[in-house]
C-alpha cells in the first residue's frame, strides 16, 4: 500500500511539474496551436526511432500532414516529400498486414497535391493483391484485420483510394474487412473494442481481467479505432450505403469514452480500471481528443455535451509537452494497459495523435 501511495505521489508530482509549461498560456489561440504543432513536428522529426514506413510512423506522418494542412508550412511539406522519396513511395512489405499501409495515408494525401502516380502505385498494387491472394494474416488468424489497431492503419488508406481513384470497390473491400474485425472484437454492451481475441471473455465469463475484476479495454486501442473512424468518415460520401453503420459506431464509442474521461481530462491506460493506472496516457487521449473535436466540428456530436470534454483534454495534452516539443506520458508499443511510462516516455504515434488533435481543435468555435 505504501509503495502504491508513493508511486501515485511521484506520478502526480511529475505531471504537475510538466504542466507548468501550459498553465499560463492560451492553448486555444490559433497562433499557439500552429506554433506548438510545428514545434512537436520538428522535435519528433529530429528524434526518429523507427523505420519511416513502419506503422508507428504511419500514425506520425498522418499527424505531420495534418500539421501541414493547418500551418501551410513549406518546410513541413518539404520534409514529407523527402520522406516519400527516400522510401520510393513504397508501403511496408507485407501486403495483407494493415500496419504496412498506414504510411500510405500520407502518400495519398501528398499525391492529391502533386499528382504523381508513382506516389501511390505501389499502395494500389498492395491493396489489390489482397483481393487475389490469401495472405499470412488471414491464414493465421482467420481474418486479415484481427486486432483493433488495424482499424486506424488500413481503412483510411482504402477510403482515400476509393475517393482519389473514383473507385468504390475500395470502400466495398474496406466494408468487408472492417465488419470482420467489428464482429470479432466489438463489445456491444460496453461499446468498446477488445484489442484482439486474447482479450475476449468466453461464455463462462472467463478471460483477462483488471485488478477490479472488470474486462480489459485498452485506451490506445480504442483511440486507434476512434481516430480511424474519423479519417474514414472524412472520406466517405454522405450517401454511401454503409456510412450509417460507421456513424453509429462512432457515436456509441464517443459516448462511452466521454463517460470514462478522468477529472484531469485524460484517459488512463485501462479504460475500466483507471485507479490501477495512475497518470494520464498521451496517445490514446490524443486520438480521443481528435475524434471528438472532429465530431463537434462536423455536427455529429452535440457541442454542449462534448466541447467541455475536448477543451479539458486539449489543455491536459499540452501539459504533457516539454518546451522543446516532446510529447511525454506516451505508453510504449504494446497491446494492453501497462504502468511503464512517465513524463519522459515518448513515441512517434503520440506526437501524431497530438498533431491530429490540434488540426481539429483549432477549428472549434467556442
Give the residues covered by each predicted segment:
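CBM-like carbohydrate-recognition segments
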Residues: 23-58, 66-86, 90-104, 110-129, ...
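Bacterial Sec-dependent N-terminal signal peptides
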Residues: 1-24
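Acidic-glycine-rich active-site phosphate/pyrophosphate-binding loop
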Residues: 32-37, 78-80, 125, 129-136, ...
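Surface loop/turn signatures of beta-propeller and other carbohydrate-active proteins
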Residues: 36, 86, 90, 136, ...
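Short, well-structured alpha-helical patches and their helix-loop capping segments
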Residues: 115, 122, 142-153, 166-173, ...
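The tetratricopeptide repeat
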Residues: 60-63, 103-106, 150, 154-157
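Asp-box/WD-like beta-propeller blade repeats and closely related beta-sheet repeat scaffolds
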Residues: 120-158
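Extended ligand-binding clefts on enzyme/binding-domain cores
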Residues: 148-149, 159-271, 278-289, 301-330, ...
Amino acid at each position: 500500500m505504501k509503495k502504491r501511495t508513493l508511486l501515485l505521489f511521484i506520478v502526480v508530482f511529475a505531471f504537475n511539474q510538466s504542466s507548468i509549461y501550459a498553465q499560463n498560456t492560451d492553448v486555444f489561440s490559433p497562433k499557439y496551436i500552429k506554433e506548438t504543432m510545428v514545434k512537436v513536428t520538428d522535435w519528433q522529426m529530429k528524434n526518429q526511432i523507427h523505420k519511416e514506413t513502419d506503422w508507428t510512423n504511419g500514425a506520425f506522418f498522418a499527424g505531420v500532414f495534418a500539421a501541414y494542412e493547418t500551418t501551410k508550412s513549406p518546410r513541413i511539406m518539404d520534409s514529407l516529400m523527402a520522406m516519400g522519396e527516400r522510401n520510393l513511395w513504397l508501403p511496408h512489405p507485407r501486403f495483407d498486414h494493415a500496419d504496412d499501409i498506414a504510411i500510405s495515408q500520407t502518400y495519398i494525401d501528398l499525391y492529391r497535391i502533386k499528382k504523381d502516380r508513382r506516389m501511390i502505385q505501389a499502395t494500389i498494387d498492395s491493396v489489390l493483391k489482397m483481393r487475389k491472394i490469401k495472405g499470412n494474416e488471414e491464414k493465421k488468424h482467420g481474418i486479415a484485420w484481427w486486432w483493433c489497431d488495424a482499424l486506424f492503419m488500413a481503412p483510411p488508406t482504402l477510403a482515400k483510394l476509393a475517393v482519389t481513384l473514383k473507385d468504390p470497390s475500395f470502400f466495398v473491400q474496406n466494408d468487408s474487412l472492417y465488419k470482420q474485425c467489428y464482429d470479432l472484437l466489438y463489445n456491444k454492451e460496453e461499446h468498446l473494442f477488445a484489442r484482439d481475441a486474447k482479450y475476449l471473455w468466453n461464455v463462462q465469463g472467463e478471460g483477462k481481467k483488471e485488478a477490479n475484476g472488470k474486462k480489459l479495454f485498452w485506451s490506445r486501442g480504442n483511440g486507434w479505432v476512434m481516430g480511424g473512424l474519423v479519417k474514414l468518415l472524412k472520406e466517405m460520401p454522405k450517401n454511401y450505403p454503409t456510412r450509417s453503420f460507421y456513424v453509429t459506431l462512432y457515436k456509441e464509442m464517443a459516448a462511452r469514452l466521454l463517460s470514462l474521461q478522468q477529472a484531469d481530462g485524460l484517459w488512463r491506460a485501462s479504460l475500466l480500471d483507471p485507479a490501477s493506472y495512475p497518470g494520464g496516457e498521451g496517445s490514446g487521449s490524443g486520438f480521443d481528443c481528435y475524434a471528438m473535436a472532429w465530431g463537434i466540428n462536423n455536427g455529429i456530436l452535440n457541442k454542449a455535451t462534448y466541447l467541455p470534454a475536448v477543451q479539458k483534454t486539449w489543455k491536459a495534452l499540452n501539459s504533457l509537452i516539454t518546451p522543446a516539443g516532446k510529447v511525454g506520458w506516451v505508453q510504449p508499443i504494446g497491446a494492453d494497459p501497462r504502468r511503464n511510462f512517465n513524463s519522459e516516455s515518448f513515441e512517434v504515434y503520440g506526437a501524431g495523435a497530438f498533431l491530429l488533435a490540434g488540426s481539429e481543435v483549432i477549428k472549434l468555435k467556442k
